[in-house]
């Protein structure tokens, strides 16, 4: 009982409870001492110590991230600006550079615009000084400097975005295209940190052999995670930086391609929600352009397993331009891939989305421009069956886009060379358009294409016309017979309905002969 009473009494705080670090090394606190900087330490507190330190002494700055509580940093002491690089001797600039970098490992809370205004401005000006220094430095960056630059990037940039699953099931019922993208409130600092990282990677004073210790696989993966940011400004910086990393760090190239591949797989087959697919494809377009010939099997598999299936998601319009560029690059590199690409397009051809169908037709034209005759012949039958369906589309833009294929000289030459196969496939669709399409522009374009076909081979054209008229007559006869059959069935059923007798219907022959008297079953 006495122990319980004493247990409720407040204890005198021990000296260790005010420290940021755990003497046993548990709870993890990383402290960096900055000599003569006006900052006693920059600390990353554990979850246990952060609460007890939140009401610290005068001058303490607690700066949680706007997006993640894991990035809360603390400054014990006064956050003061360091001397300018102009005010110190050249020999002291490298040390001052590292001190300024360490000073920028503090993350402030930008969700509250009125909080820590002075400290935020000091940090922003310090970051700008660092960017200028890296742009003008004439000596190789030291190992310590590169480590601190990487640390600034990790502390300021890397964070987890909310809603990892993107609530995809809920978003399916919403028109997410009309939503305004969320802008990062900490952008005044993030932008300069990105600029610092970009200058660091692009600088000739950065030794890639040393820098790869810090710009490692883990760093690259976290950088790729940031491509899901809703802020397009951030994605533009990420695109440029990742491209620079790919160019400078050759050892990371296969890993970067594989990591992007995995992002695509997850997007295609799991989430169908990612904000940075267009930017990643833009990087890949440049990478594919630099592929050596002949193409490696790994690169061909990437086309088949990742790029072609990217046509499947509903939101493909958000990145289709970049995707189309990548696809065409592959066909231009290896024309034998044209058949694979065209059959892939046909596999994912939209059925109910007309605007997406127009995009597919545009991409198809670009692919066909790079297609040689041999590959064209392998896929022309299924291809022009789909084009014939597009010609008869009630959506006038789809029909128009399909007819525009005949305006392309290369495609028209391919069609002319294989007109004996293609004309019988598309002729019925053309003829139906001229007779009954509701849109006058489609009718006019169809007549022009019809004229081209007649000039190509008048004999085959006449045969196709005769075949179409014969099929049309047969179809009319079939419809008439079907209507007659139903009419006779109704009359037979009406005559038996008074006596409530079951109506026995004989098996009808192809001539649809009905027994009006006694049947074989009566």
Swiss-Prot record:
UniProt KW keywords: Brassinosteroid signaling pathway, Cytoplasm, Flowering, Nucleus, Plant defense, Stress response
Nucleus among keywords: yes
Its biological purpose: The B regulatory subunit may modulate substrate selectivity and catalytic activity, and may also direct the localization of the catalytic enzyme to a particular subcellular compartment. Required for the formation of the PP2A holoenzyme that negatively regulates brassinosteroid signaling by dephosphorylating and inactivating BRI1 in the cytoplasm. Seems to be functionally connected with CPR5 and may mediate the negative regulation of defense reactions and senescence under low irradiances. May contribute to the epigenetic regulation of defense gene expression.
Compositional bias ranges of the Polar residues kind: 63-74
Protein's gene: B'GAMMA
Tissues where the protein occurs: Expressed ubiquitously at low levels. Expressed in roots, emerging lateral roots, cotyledons, leaves, floral stalks and flowers.
Low complexity compositional bias, start-end: 35-58
UniProt-annotated location(s): Cytoplasm, Cytosol; Nucleus
Complexes and interactors: PP2A consists of a common heteromeric enzyme, composed of a catalytic subunit (subunits C), a constant regulatory subunit (subunit A), and a variety of regulatory subunits such as subunits B (the R2/B/PR55/B55, R3/B''/PR72/PR130/PR59 and R5/B'/B56 families). Interacts with BRI1. Interacts with IGMT1 and IGMT4. Interacts with ACO3 in the cytosol.
Protein's name in the database: Serine/threonine protein phosphatase 2A 59 kDa regulatory subunit B' gamma isoform
GO (cellular component) term, any one: cytosol
Top-level taxonomic group: Eukaryota
Disordered, as annotated region: 1-74
GO biological process: brassinosteroid mediated signaling pathway; defense response; flower development; indole glucosinolate biosynthetic process; methionine metabolic process; negative regulation of defense response; negative regulation of leaf senescence; regulation of reactive oxygen species metabolic process
GO MF entries: poly(U) RNA binding; protein phosphatase regulator activity
């Amino acid at each position: 009982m006495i122990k319980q009473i004493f247990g409720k009494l407040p204890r005198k705080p021990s000296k260790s409870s005010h420290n940021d670090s755990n003497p046993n090394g548990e709870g993890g606190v990383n402290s960096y001492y900055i000599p003569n900087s006006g900052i006693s330490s920059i600390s990353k507190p554990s979850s246990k110590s952060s609460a007890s330190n939140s009401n610290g002494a005068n001058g303490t700055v607690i700066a949680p991230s706007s997006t993640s509580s894991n990035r809360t940093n603390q400054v014990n002491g006064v956050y003061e600006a360091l001397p300018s690089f102009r005010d110190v001797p050249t020999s002291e600039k490298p040390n001052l550079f590292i001190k300024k970098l360490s000073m920028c490992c503090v993350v402030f809370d930008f969700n509250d615009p009125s909080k820590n205004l002075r400290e935020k401005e000091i940090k922003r000006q310090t970051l700008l000084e660092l960017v200028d220094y890296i742009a003008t430095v004439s000596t190789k960056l030291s190992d310590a400097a590169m480590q601190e630059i990487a640390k600034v990037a990790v502390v300021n940039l890397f964070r987890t975005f909310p809603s990892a699953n993107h609530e995809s099931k809920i978003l399916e019922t919403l028109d997410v295209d009309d939503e305004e993208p969320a802008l990062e409130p900490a952008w005044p600092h993030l932008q300069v940190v990105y600029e610092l990282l970009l200058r660091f990677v692009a600088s000739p004073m950065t030794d890639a052999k040393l820098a790869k210790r810090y710009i490692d696989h883990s760093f690259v993966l976290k950088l790729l995670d940031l491509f899901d940011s809703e802020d397009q400004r951030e994605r533009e910086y990420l695109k440029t930086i990742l491209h620079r990393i790919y160019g400078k760090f050759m050892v990371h190239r296969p890993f970067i391609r594989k990591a992007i591949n995995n992002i695509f797989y997850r997007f295609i087959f799991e989430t169908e929600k990612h904000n940075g697919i267009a930017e990643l494809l833009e990087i890949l377009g440049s990478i594919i352009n630099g592929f050596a010939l002949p193409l490696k099997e790994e690169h061909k598999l990437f086309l088949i397993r990742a790029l072609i299936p990217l046509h499947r998601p509903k939101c493909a319009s958000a990145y289709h331009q970049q995707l189309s560029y990548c696809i065409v690059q592959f066909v231009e590199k290896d024309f034998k891939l044209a058949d694979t690409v065209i059959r892939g397009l046909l596999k994912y051809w939209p059925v109910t989305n007309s605007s997406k169908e127009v995009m597919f037709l545009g991409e198809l034209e670009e692919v066909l421009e790079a297609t040689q005759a041999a590959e064209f012949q392998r896929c022309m039958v299924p291809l022009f069956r789909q084009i014939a369906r597009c010609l008869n589309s009630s959506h006038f833009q789809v029909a128009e886009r399909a007819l525009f294929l005949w305006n392309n000289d290369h495609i028209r030459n391919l069609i002319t060379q294989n007109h004996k196969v293609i004309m019988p496939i598309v002729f019925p669709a053309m003829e139906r358009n001229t007779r009954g399409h509701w849109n006058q522009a489609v009718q006019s374009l169809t007549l022009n294409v019809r004229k081209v076909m007649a000039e190509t081979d008048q004999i085959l054209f006449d045969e196709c016309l005769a075949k179409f008229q014969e099929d049309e007559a047969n179809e009319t006869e079939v419809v008439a017979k079907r209507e007659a059959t139903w009419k006779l069935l109704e009359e037979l059923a009406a005559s038996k309905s008074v006596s409530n007798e079951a109506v026995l219907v004989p098996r009808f022959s192809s001539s649809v002969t009905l027994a009006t008297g006694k049947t074989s079953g009566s």
